[in-house]
Design a protein with these regions (language model features):
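Transmembrane-helix motifs of polytopic, lipid-linked glycan transferases
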Residues: 81-102, 116, 139, 341-344
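Loop-to-helix entry region of an early transmembrane alpha helix in multi-pass inner-membrane enzymes
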Residues: 56, 60-67, 72-92, 123, ...
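Multi-pass, polyprenyl lipid-linked donor-dependent membrane glycosyltransferases
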Residues: 30, 57, 78-86, 109-144, ...
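Membrane-interface transmembrane helices that cradle and orient dolichyl/undecaprenyl
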Residues: 102-104, 140-160, 168, 189-192, ...
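Transmembrane-helix signature of polytopic, membrane-embedded enzymes
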Residues: 94-116, 134-135, 153-156, 358-361
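Extracytoplasmic catalytic/substrate-binding loops of multi-pass membrane glycan-assembly enzymes
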Residues: 24-38, 48, 53-65, 74-77, ...
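Membrane-proximal stem/loop segments at transmembrane-domain junctions that anchor or position
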Residues: 228-308
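Membrane-interface anchor segments at the N-terminal boundary of transmembrane helices
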Residues: 75-78, 83, 286-287, 293-364
Length: 413
């Protein structure tokens, strides 16, 4: 109860932001309609995607979360206020996880920094995947840490960590590929090092994959493709591969550009028109092939797009055909500080790798796999939020245990 009271000011700030935002946006805004529509489809037919070409655009995780609200006919503000409760629960998770490595005071400082991070506040009032992903990431970090620190309940925390990672993949399908990469990595690590910590991490990823099997099987019956997560990946990779000098790999149109023409995508108009009548899976495959061709033909331009994309992931800039505006500072200033801090912490992380607790290394690696995957897809600042709590765990540990606060000298072990 004391922890909840100490987090109450942060919770009140979150609630006020959501209430004020909802007063100005009582209806659905860009990005929300897709998830609400999916939730209604799940409620009415048990299917996320309906119609003549029922291939989901995104994972079912967040629409499933919205289903109870739609059953109860909850207004939009109620569904948005749920985000404040998700962040409160996530903060409780994170406080308990960080207490193993820092004092209570610094654990609260870290959690408040996360909760007041401007990008978190920007997307908090919206019915999109990021708030629930923050909660799930906090839960994943907590259970992976307790899996090592609480031997008496190790099996419980192992299973729960797997469930949280699995639901993260259902909410943000990129985590599906993170799971696949992590399975291979931890399997090799377990075979080479023969350490139980690596074996436990492997079991977590296998449980996470098992959580996703029903969804993957349903997609397989629709598409004939194993391990097919959603149809958005091809378009994202296509924009990232753009060979035109004025473009930086960002998303130039709405989610379905073949349904209409946008001036930003004028250079892509002919190719986009050729996709209009294709089935979803064939369209996705065509986009992927064209993206790969662009990358092979213009590797230097793709490298430039990649640098711009990583920068955009942290500071929400640059964008194609768009100049800077004062409002961009909301993301650029804190994002630049976060990016610099992460780059500075890479050095002590590498230097002290063997002395960093296994559970912190594992949380860091999952976040690293996700960021690496997002770096080759068209990215924005909101896409960093699903691993932001894991980054907080990593940064807090590194700053507390490998850097001397008085003079910032590294401690090498």
């Amino acid at each position: 109860m004391r922890t909840v009271l100490r987090l109450l000011p942060l919770f009140i700030v979150h609630v006020l932001i959501i209430v004020v935002y909802s007063q100005g946006h009582p209806g659905l805004v860009a990005g929300e309609n897709r998830y609400v529509t999916d939730a209604v489809n799940l409620m009415e037919s048990g299917e996320q995607a309906v119609g003549k070409d029922p291939v989901p655009w995104n994972g079912p995780g967040y629409p499933l979360f919205l289903v109870p609200f739609k059953i109860l006919r909850a207004p939009n503000i109620t569904m948005r206020l749920a985000n404040a409760f998700l962040l409160l629960l996530g903060s409780l998770y994170l406080i308990r996880a960080l207490r193993y490595y820092v004092s209570g005071k610094w654990a609260y400082v870290a959690v408040y920094c996360m909760g007041l991070y401007p990008v978190v506040l920007k997307y908090l009032p919206r019915m999109i995947t990021e708030p629930i992903c923050i909660f799930l990431a906090c839960g994943l970090a907590f259970h992976m840490i307790h899996m090592k620190r609480n031997p008496e309940r190790r099996t419980l925390h192992l299973v729960l960590a797997g469930l949280y990672l699995g639901f993260l993949a259902l909410a943000k399908v990129l985590f599906g590929y993170v799971i696949a990469l992590a399975i291979v990595f931890f399997l090799v690590l377990a075979l080479v090092q023969r350490k139980r910590s690596a074996l436990r991490a492997l079991l977590v990823t296998l449980i996470a994959l098992a959580v996703c099997v029903p969804y993957l099987y349903k997609n397989y019956t629709r598409t004939g493709k194993p391990f097919y997560w959603a149809q958005a990946g091809g378009l994202s990779l296509y924009w990232m591969s753009s060979p035109f000098e004025e473009e930086y790999g960002d998303w130039l149109t709405g989610t379905k550009p073949w349904l209409g023409n946008y001036w930003k995508a004028e250079k892509h108009k002919r190719f986009m028109e050729s996709l209009q009548d294709l089935p979803a899976v064939e369209r996705d495959d065509t986009l992927r092939r064209e993206a790969v061709r662009n990358i092979k033909d213009h590797p230097g331009k793709f490298a430039k797009n990649w640098v711009a994309n990583v920068t955009r992931l942290f500071i929400h800039h640059p964008f194609s055909y768009k100049g800077q505006a004062m409002r961009d500072l909301r993301s650029m200033v804190p994002g630049s500080a976060l990016l610099v801090l992460c780059l500075l912490c890479v050095i002590p992380t590498v230097a002290n790798w063997r002395s960093i607790p296994a559970e912190v290394r594992q949380v860091f690696l999952i976040a690293l796999f996700y960021v690496a995957g997002n770096s080759v897809l068209s990215a924005y600042d909101r896409m960093l939020l699903p691993v932001f709590p894991m980054m907080v765990v990593w940064l807090t540990y590194i700053l507390a245990h490998t850097v001397q606060p008085g003079c910032f000298r590294l401690r090498f072990h």
